[in-house]
Amino acid sequence: MKRVTKHLVRLGISLFVLFVLIISAWVFFYFRSYQQKEFKLGVNFSKSYSEYLELNWQKTFVAILDDLKVKNVRLAAPWNEIEPVKDHWVFTDLDWQVNEAVKRNVDIVLILGRRTPHWPECHDPAWIIGLPQEIVVERQLKMVQKVVDHYKNVKNIKIWQVENEPMLDAFGICPPSDINLLRQEVSLVKNLDDRPILITDSGELSFWIAAANTGDLFGTTMYRVTHNPWLGYLYYHLPPAFYNFKA
């Protein structure tokens, strides 16, 4: 009986010490300063989302460049916009965005691939619906090559972003994530141009391991509040340590 009592006492002390250590570590990292002294501010621009908001997308983009005077902008090449019909390539609107940024000496991150920002994430052209998966992949790689070939002489494009959060399966209407296909895309872009490749992943819903080890640069998100049609508003009370730990 005495042995059992001693064992329980030791276990209780050990659990208490462990609890104190965990709480202390949490408090330390929660209140620790993570201020970044050197960083660049930029914006993301989406033609389709501007239209969704019933804005004149060209006037909106010019206002962002001239009124906000941003020097870094992220643009996208949604598949359904640049190849609306098989082998019919339309770069007119994206060319306009790129040229307006170049006029003002704005640095560009260009997103390419099947998955680009904003719902439904995978902006598939209608003509790929029903095609065998291997054909879709073949066409996807061809689309990536076309985009890089079209823009690789634009010096203001500093970074290629290949896909947008490609390992995130919890959001968007997309096929399951495929790290091997992502690596194929990255390898293809590297063979076409030597600028760095950015891979992104969700700040709250992913572990970053696969994405962070695929490109030259890694980017993530930080959401404090999101809205879900079934659950309503969701609040992420996550300290900086949450992101620092994953990094």
Feature annotation, model-predicted:
Residues R115-W119, Q140-P175:
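Active-site groove signature of glycoside hydrolases
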Residues S24-K71, A76:
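Boundary/entry segment of secreted carbohydrate-active catalytic domains
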Residues Q58-H123, C174-L198, L234-L238:
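Aromatic-lined substrate-binding rim segments of carbohydrate-active enzymes
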Residues S46-Y52, W79-F91, A126-E138, N164-P176, ...:
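The substrate-binding groove and active-site-proximal loops of carbohydrate-active enzymes
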Residues L41-F45, V73-L75, I108-L112, K158-V162, ...:
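Hydrophobic faces of well-ordered beta-strands that scaffold small-molecule active sites
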Residues E51-D67, Q140-V148, D201-A211:
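Short, acidic/polar
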Residues I179, N191-A247:
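Glycoside hydrolase catalytic-domain groove-lining segments
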Residues M1-V20:
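N-terminal Sec-pathway targeting helices
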